[in-house]
């Protein structure tokens, strides 16, 4: 049975609010520590973890669980929107208002978001083709845990340095 529209909107709002607060508290924890207030930083971190847990609750209620392929394609779509519409519009508006520094930043971040879209789409294609850990020609693979570098058509099944499984390797 579909969820009532107001409840659905409230769940979405709760999810976005909790993720925003999580991020804000994490930043404030770092600032507090840099100012010498370690107990305050710890408090912000503890509450931030609670906010993250709350966000996960709302996300699950929204039935947003996706398989990896779906998540990669959804992420690519979100990144596409960010660079091609959102940041492009904001950059134009900043330029029109004479805020050239903000325009430049919006355009620079848009370029990064376009790169993110490409990375998500390439990984989705590799998964779809069964090529996540296979390359037609030798490439460099890096272990995300310890940084071990391996060159070959595929990464080792187990990292020889930290013994993490192949799933920790990505093309460099």
Each predicted region: which residue ranges?
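Non-heme di-metal
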Residues: 1-172
């Amino acid at each position: 049975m579909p969820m009532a529209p107001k409840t659905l909107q409230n769940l979405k709002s709760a999810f976005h609010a909790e993720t925003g607060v999580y991020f804000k508290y994490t930043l404030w924890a770092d600032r507090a520590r840099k100012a010498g207030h370690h107990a305050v930083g710890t408090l912000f971190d503890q509450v931030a973890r609670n906010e993250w847990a709350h966000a996960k609750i709302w996300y699950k209620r929204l039935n947003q669980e996706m398989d990896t392929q779906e998540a990669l394609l959804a992420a690519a779509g979100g990144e596409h929107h960010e660079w091609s519409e959102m940041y492009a519009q904001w950059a134009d508006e900043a330029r029109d208002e004479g805020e050239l520094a903000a325009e430049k930043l919006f355009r620079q971040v848009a370029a990064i978001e376009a790169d993110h879209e490409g990375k998500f789409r390439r990984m989705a294609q590799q998964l779809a083709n069964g090529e996540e850990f296979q390359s037609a020609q030798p490439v460099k693979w890096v272990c995300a845990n310890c940084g071990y570098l391996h060159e070959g058509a595929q990464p080792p099944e187990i990292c020889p340095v930290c013994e993490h499984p192949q799933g920790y390797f990505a093309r460099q």
